[in-house]
Amino acid sequence: MLLGLDISTSITGFTILDHQGEIIRCDAWDMRNKNKFKKIFDKASFIKDDLLFFKAQYPINSIYIEQPFMFFNSGGSSAKTMASLQRFNGIISWICYDIFGMDLFTGAPN
């Protein structure tokens, strides 16, 4: 099975596909509640708990992580935002590697 992740600090999407490409699960983690998710590590821990559940429930043998947003958008991104996204992508990528023990595949955003 394949686990696909679209990582963001506000909403991170995930999809689990079986070997025929059929969707097993498709959802997102909404982490916009600043009272619940005060720090970036609170968000990472929240995702980690579900990834541990996925590891126990599904025979995931491939992980695909969308490449993080890499360019400035007039009025839509700042250096601080870009750094935060890059840092969170790295944290979640490491958690995936640690839990699943496999190399990750990354791809360019559309």
Where are the regions that the model predicts?
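Phosphate- and other anionic-substrate recognition elements at nucleic-acid/protein interfaces
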Residues: M1-N110
